[in-house]
Design a protein with these regions (language model features):
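Catalytic glycan-binding domains that act on GlcNAc-containing polysaccharides
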Residues: 1-135
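Low-complexity, Gly/Ser/Thr/Pro-rich intrinsically disordered linker/tail segments
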Residues: 133-143
Length: 143
């Protein structure tokens, strides 16, 4: 959830800003990222191929959340801690190859963003566990 917040602010149609031609005319976008997860075209296609979810849409919240889980699970199998949202986000942004090369070290702004993602992730986790206790209570409903 903290990745979605950071990448798209929970907006289904989020896209990167356009570059400007002659400082005024809207031009091409900086990347092919689209939707809640801001997944790039090639990575999204890999996800659809590997999961068999050929009808997945980056503008669908469920599909985007599943994509982020799929991508993070690749990190888990490479030794990432599942609760280390900071490192997972850096790998999400830079790619696992870029993370291994530590390309993020040349981007202090990205490290700050990853720290915010970790903080938000911890907050969301605490909120979830608070709600989980309430949801597990047995209730009787009368119709």
């Amino acid at each position: 959830m903290s990745f979605v917040y950071q990448e798209s602010s929970f907006k289904a149609d989020a896209k990167p800003e356009r570059t400007k031609l002659l400082w005024v005319i809207p031009w091409k976008r900086k990347s092919t990222a689209v939707g809640y997860s801001q997944a790039l075209n090639m990575t999204w296609e890999d996800y659809k191929d590997e999961t068999g979810n050929s009808g997945a849409s980056r503008k669908n919240f469920k599909d985007s959340a599943d994509f982020i889980g799929w991508y993070a699970s690749k990190g888990y199998y490479q030794g990432f801690d599942r609760l280390d949202a900071r490192s997972l986000y850096l790998a999400y942004h830079e790619g696992y190859g870029g993370f291994k090369k530590k390309t993020y070290r040349k981007k202090p702004w990205l490290i700050k963003v990853a720290d915010r993602v970790q903080t938000r992730s911890t907050k969301y986790q605490q909120q979830y566990w608070g709600c989980a206790k309430e949801l597990k209570k047995k209730r009787f409903f009368f119709f």
